[in-house]
Design a protein with these regions (language model features):
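Detector for C-terminal structural segments
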Residues: 30, 312-341, 384-393, 415-534
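N-terminal lobe/hinge region of extracytoplasmic solute-binding protein
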Residues: 38-97, 128, 197
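Gly/Pro-rich hinge or "lid" segments in bacterial periplasmic/extracellular proteins
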Residues: 78, 173-228, 234
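Surface-exposed binding/hinge segments that line
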Residues: 103-105, 139-184
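Structural transition elements
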Residues: 329-364, 381-387
Length: 534
């Protein structure tokens, strides 16, 4: 097979994918067999999380990737670059100079998949419901600037905000703002199980075994009315226990596409293969990984302990040994490719330095070695997570300042325990809800945040976050965003580690893979089609 490298044109913020590809048609067609997509995302309905696919609760990339295919939002993020554009709406925009009143007009003739008409009242119901339920996942925080939702007739929706929020159009493109049918979703109760009723480009039928979704079939919604053009009639998503099983399925032809999460070894092998029936797409991503601290926990309550960890951890070594060229060290919660990024942690701590860390602990009268347990999820972020934490353990213990053990748990157990504050130190990842610096800061630092963290900085919450949101020009918001990042680097409630790239592997007759995932890790199944094999 002759491979070629295709670089899509970079346009004002476009994160262009690089394609190591075979020849074939560039355009997919409707019809034909279902395109089968593999993922290692696990979807479980449990006592702690009974409603994994309710838009008012779901707040992880896997669940959102299902909702984005099935539940329509007023706005949508374009596949390449730029600001959100109307989707279920015909038009949207701020109607005042202060960015506090936002109005949308729904498309005429909009319907749910079952044929029920969609009105402005349904939009209001959906937003009000998410805010009323206040799910412990923290997803409702994306709508925290909404004061009231007003309707005028069947097609006009007006959002009155409690403070200026230039990022609000982005927030209306996220699943928590998705339009749901009041017939199927109670106002104050989450919808248990895996059923979804929306107006998105697909309907979804779930195959469930032992309270776990193992297979989801997405079928083209004949009532869909929006901006998306579907290149297929049906896509099947299969959940695999691990990357190895998913890779074997692709090799055997049981699946057509492999998405997150592949192992670093798989990515290296497929990228370097000179004769393969598998195509690999590499694209820049906005995913980050970090350590988070329960700042109320005795072991890390003293800021000096957290600062010492920040001073010892060697990001370059960590990335090199685990991910190689698939990731880059990160010295801020905001990725280097996002407007507003500042190398705050490098500016404060510089290169790893055990002597400096020792001095920090000594000045705070901290007895060493400090005993810590680092917790991680064994199945949510891919097979390399364990090795990553083994290296963190090795680095910290080698300093002589820490006595670190590591402990892994499945996401089903890990996430509820983290939300309850059961872990002193734990590792998490973040796929942005939208590509703006605000979404790397507010979800962790604002009130009702996604980590349920006890850390509070009043200047960040009451001054800097609101200040940054007033600026429609995000470059102008830079000073506020930089100040937030500097405070985080000093207090270390969170320690950023690295930012990663994204990869999609596919059979050679599958088209559209270069746009199957956008920069925020949104799966865009409608882009996939079938071309011609070489």
């Amino acid at each position: 097979m002759n491979r070629k490298t295709l670089v899509l044109p970079a346009v004002a913020g476009l994160l262009a994918p690089v394609l190591a590809a075979c020849g074939g048609s560039d355009s997919g067609g409707n019809g034909g067999d279902a395109i089968v997509v593999g993922t290692t995302d696990r979807f479980t309905a449990s006592k702690e999380d009974p409603a994994p696919l309710d838009p008012a609760f779901a707040y992880d990339v896997g669940s959102w990737n299902i909702l984005r295919q099935t539940v329509q939002t007023l706005m949508i993020q374009p596949k390449g670059e730029g600001d959100p554009v109307p989707e279920a709406a015909e038009r949207c925009g701020f109607t005042d100079s202060g960015n506090e009143r936002y109005a949308c007009t729904l498309r005429d003739g909009l319907k749910f998949a079952n044929g029920d008409p969609i009105t402005a009242a349904d939009v209001k119901y959906s937003i009000d419901r998410a805010l009323a339920i206040k799910a412990d996942s923290g997803v409702f925080g994306l709508l925290s600037t909404v004061d009231t939702v007003e309707t005028q007739g069947d097609r006009e929706v007006i959002f009155h905000l409690n403070t200026a929020d230039a990022t609000f159009p982005f927030k209306l493109s996220t699943p928590v703002a998705g339009i749901i049918n009041p017939k199927n979703y109670e106002k104050t109760t989450l919808r248990a199980g895996f059923a979804i009723d929306g107006s998105g480009p697909y309907t979804m039928k779930a195959k469930v075994e032992n309270d776990e979704l193992v297979d989801a079939v997405f079928t083209k919604n004949p009532n869909y009315k929006g901006t998306l053009e579907l290149n297929n009639d049906k896509v099947e998503m299969r959940s695999f226990e691990d990357a190895g099983a998913m890779g074997d399925a692709l090799d055997k032809g049981d699946i057509d596409v492999m998405t997150r999460t592949m192992s670093p070894e798989q990515i290296r092998t497929l990228t370097n293969a000179s004769d393969s029936k598998i195509d690999m797409v590499e694209m820049p991503g906005l995913e980050i990984r970090y350590l988070a601290f329960n700042t109320d926990a005795p072991s890390v309550k003293d800021k000096a302990v957290r600062q010492a960890v920040a001073q010892v951890v060697n990001r370059s070594e960590l990335v090199s040994e685990v991910y190689g060229s698939q990731a880059e060290p990160l010295y801020s919660l905001v990725p280097a490719t996002v407007t507003g990024h500042s190398n705050a942690f490098f500016n404060k701590y510089g290169d790893p330095d055990v002597a400096k860390a020792k001095s920090m602990l000594a000045k705070a009268d901290i007895t060493t070695p400090v005993k810590l347990t680092l917790h991680y999820t064994t199945d949510h972020y891919g097979p390399a997570t364990k090795k990553e934490f083994e290296i963190l353990q090795k680095q910290l213990n080698a300093s002589g300042l820490f006595d670190v053990t590591i402990e892994g748990a499945t996401w089903e157990k890990f996430r509820p325990a983290e939300l309850k504050g059961s872990y002193d130190v734990y590792g998490m990842g973040w796929f942005p809800d939208f590509p703006d610096a605000d979404n790397y800061l507010a979800p962790f630092l604002d009130k009702d945040n996604t980590l349920n963290t006890p850390y509070v900085n009043s200047r960040i919450r009451n001054t800097l976050i609101p200040e940054s949101r007033r600026e429609a020009d995000r470059l102008t918001a830079g000073s506020s965003l930089t100040a937030i990042q500097d405070i985080v680097a000093d207090d270390v409630p969170i320690l950023p580690l690295w930012q990663g790239k994204q990869y999609v592997a596919s059979a050679e007759d599958v088209t559209g893979t270069a746009y199957a995932i956008n920069s925020t890790a949104t799966l865009q199944l409608w882009e996939l089609g079938r071309g011609v094999k070489n």
